[in-house]
Each structure stands twice: as C-alpha cells, then as structure tokens.
C-alpha cells in the first residue's frame, strides 16, 4: 500500500534549485541621463520651474546613472498629455499601455532565457511573473503564457505590486517550487515599465522627483530547476537558502499607491540608513550555517535602489570597492528597474566572470549573496553558490 509519505518523497527533487539560464530585454528607446533633465522639463511643460529643474539636474548628476531605457517616447507622451501633468487623472491611459507592453517585454527576455536553456518550452512546468507596472485580470502571467505558446496546464503565479525587493522574492518562490516538484522547470519573469510612475515635477513632492531621476524599464527572465540533466542543462548558480524580513522602525519608508493619477511614490530620507543599519543581521543569519562572517569573501548582488544605499552598505560592512562593481554597472547602464535589477546583475556577473577567465560564475568566488530591498521596508536575502564557468 502506497502511503502519503511515499508520494511526498517521490514528489521531491533530490538536489538544490539552480538557475539554468538568464535573459534580459529593454525597450528600444534609450535615454541619456545627462540630457534627461532638459527633455523631462520640456515634455512636461515645466520649463518655467527653473529652480526645480536645477534641483533635478543635481539629482540626475548624483544618480550614477549614464542611461536608461523607456517605453515612453516623446510621441507617446504627446499623444497622452495627462500622463505628463503632475497628478492628473491618467490611470486609464497608463493601464492601456502597460497591460500590453509588460507581457510583451517579458516575452523578449523569456525567449532569450529559453534559447540559452536549450530545452523545448513544453518542458516548462511553472511560470512566476512579477511586475509593479499595472494590474489586470487575467494577469500578465496569462498573457505571457499565450504569447510564448506555453502549455495551458503550466502552473502560474502572478505577483503584482511588490516593488523593488521582488527580484529576491521570485527566486525564493522558484526555489521552493523547483525543490518540491521533481522535474519542475520554473520560468521566472520580472517585467517593469515606468509608464505607471512617470509624471511632471512638483515643488511639494520631491520624492516623486527622485523616482523620475532613477527609474528605468527592463525585463529579466530565468529558468530555475533542480537536478539538471547532465550534458544538456548547464546550471549557473545554486539557490542555497532564501529569507525575507521587515526591517524594524521602517514603517512608511517606501510607499507606492495606485491612484487615479497612476502609481505614486513616497520615500523617507533615511532609507539608506535604515537598510545599512540592519543589513549585517540579515547577512549573519543567512551565513551562520556556513560559518562565513567575512563579507568580502562573498560575491555581491544588491538591488541598486540608488547610489546612497550602495555607498552606505559598502561603508557599514567595510566592503572592498569591487564587491558592488556588477551592481553599480547595472545601475549605470539601466537605472533602477525595480524587481528586474538583481536578475540583470546576476546576468552581468556570470558573463563578466566567464569573459575574465575566472573559475566560477561568481567572480571566481564560491559563495554569494543577493539582496532585494523595497517597500516595507522589506529585505529579501538569497544565499547563492556559484558553479564553474
């Protein structure tokens, strides 16, 4: 007689979840950060706000961003003037854009990941889709299933409105799905488009202006599975453990609210301080089982919320400058793409590690950490084990 325990054992994978492939995509429209303040104040009819424009220029200069990619072109904004105003009712116009474009950009990234994985897409058993750009029913997960031609029986999970920590969340979920379902191959997609947050400047809402200086569009996709097929699947990283926590005394530090005017963004000044003050506790809890306490012995992937967060984390933990190289590179080339950022950094790291002839995907090191930071303040901590390049 077969018992429930027998069935349970048979359902479980043997090895840890691994990242088997990564793909990324951006809209074609590239925006130069050095000329963006002029463009932004012109397109939003705000050129008379000279003092505010100077303030915005300083924000852009300090952002450490060289360029960003944006679905919103000048043509689209001219056709939708309400999106350019500060706090004008515009949710319908924004929704009409993102419900189409978010799955489309996700498809581009997913197609690249599936190609690298090298297996037929019919072998994808689960889909996790994550976006903070718009909400719809059926969701972007359903739309992507149709766009990619996945099996109708693919098991879908749609994550809306999680914000910047969610790149860590999707890895945590994919790990659990892969390890508890033998043979599972999980397609994870994060797709973000700033059409929900773009708006004109205001003297009274400077945190909104911070978002206008930092946010960019991008999608990233990964394939996660346990027990890779030898000679067929080439794992890049193992997902060793994953944790989530809400930081103490951080209520209201980062908020986003979906309103008639789109997604509004609110930020307290001390977000970098709150994160840097608490990050060592998360690291200690994650790496204590491995007996690791030298944070410079790890490879690092941290959500680049902004340069101040990275600077303070570096300072607090005494990290060498090169530790956040991959993170800073992605911030500089793409801006803050919310949930997609950490997956872009994972991709950048494994590619540069191979190009530099290093022995592992994690800059030649064995163990690494991936951090997601976002509304809550919520922190996701993922322990990674690199594999040979």
Curated annotation (Swiss-Prot):
Pathway the protein takes part in: Secondary metabolite biosynthesis; flavonoid biosynthesis
Pfam families cross-referenced by the UniProt entry: Chal_sti_synt_C (PF02797), Chal_sti_synt_N (PF00195)
Superkingdom of source: Eukaryota
Top EC class, one word: transferase
Cysteines joined through disulfide linkages: none
Active-site residues annotated for this sequence: 164
InterPro entries xrefs: Chalcone/stilbene_synt_C, Chalcone/stilbene_synt_N, Chalcone/stilbene_synthase_AS, Polyketide_synthase_type-III, Thiolase-like
UniProt keyword list: Acyltransferase, Flavonoid biosynthesis, Transferase
CDD domains: CHS_like
MF (Gene Ontology): naringenin-chalcone synthase activity
A GO BP entry: polyketide biosynthetic process
Residue spans crossing the bilayer: none
Catalytic activity: (E)-4-coumaroyl-CoA + 3 malonyl-CoA + 3 H(+) = 2',4,4',6'-tetrahydroxychalcone + 3 CO2 + 4 CoA
Signal peptide positions (record): none
EC numbers: 2.3.1.74
Family per similarity comment: Belongs to the thiolase-like superfamily. Chalcone/stilbene synthases family.
Cross-referenced PANTHER family: CHALCONE SYNTHASE 1, HYDROXYMETHYLGLUTARYL-COA SYNTHASE
Role of this protein: The primary product of this enzyme is 4,2',4',6'-tetrahydroxychalcone (also termed naringenin-chalcone or chalcone) which can under specific conditions spontaneously isomerize into naringenin.
Name used for this protein in its record: Chalcone synthase 1
Source species of the chain: Camellia sinensis (Tea plant)
Encoding gene per record: CHS1
């Amino acid at each position: 007689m077969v018992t429930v325990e027998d069935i349970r054992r048979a359902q479980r994978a043997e090895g840890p979840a691994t990242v088997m492939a990564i793909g990324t995509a951006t809209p074609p429209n590239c925006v130069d950060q050095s000329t963006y303040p002029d463009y932004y104040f012109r397109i939003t009819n705000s050129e008379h706000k000279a003092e505010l424009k100077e303030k915005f220029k300083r924000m852009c200069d300090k952002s450490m961003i060289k360029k960003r990619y944006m679905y919103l072109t000048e043509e689209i904004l001219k056709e939708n003037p309400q999106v350019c105003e500060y706090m004008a009712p515009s949710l319908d116009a924004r929704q009409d854009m993102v419900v189409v474009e978010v799955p489309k950009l996700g498809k581009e990234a997913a197609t690249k990941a599936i190609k690298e994985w090298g297996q037929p897409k019919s072998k994808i058993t689960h889909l996790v889709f994550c976006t903070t750009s718009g909400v719809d029913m059926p969701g972007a997960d359903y739309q992507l299933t149709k766009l990619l031609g996945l099996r109708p029986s693919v098991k879908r999970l749609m994550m809306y409105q999680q914000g910047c920590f969610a790149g860590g969340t999707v890895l945590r979920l994919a790990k659990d799905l892969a390890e508890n379902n033998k043979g599972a191959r999980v397609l994870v997609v994060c797709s973000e488009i700033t059409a929900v947050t773009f708006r004109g400047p205001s003297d009274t809402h400077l945190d909104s202006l911070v978002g206008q200086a930092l946010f960019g569009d991008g999608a990233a996709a990964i394939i996660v599975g346990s027990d890779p097929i030898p000679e067929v699947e080439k794992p890049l990283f193992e997902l060793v453990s994953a944790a989530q926590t809400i930081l103490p005394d951080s209520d209201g530090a980062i908020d986003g609210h979906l309103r008639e005017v789109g997604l509004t963004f609110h930020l307290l000044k001390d977000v970098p301080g709150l994160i840097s003050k608490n990050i060592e506790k998360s690291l200690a809890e994650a790496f204590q089982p491995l007996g690791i306490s030298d944070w410079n012995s790890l490879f690092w992937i941290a959500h680049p919320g902004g340069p101040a967060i990275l600077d303070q984390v570096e300072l607090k933990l005494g990290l060498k400058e090169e530790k956040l190289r991959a993170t800073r590179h992605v911030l500089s080339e793409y801006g803050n793409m919310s949930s997609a950022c950490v997956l872009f950094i994972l991709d950048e790291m494994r590619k540069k590690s191979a190009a530099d002839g290093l022995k592992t995907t994690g800059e030649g090191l064995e163990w690494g950490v991936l951090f997601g930071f976002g509304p809550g303040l919520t922190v996701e901590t993922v322990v990674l084990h690199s594999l040979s390049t």
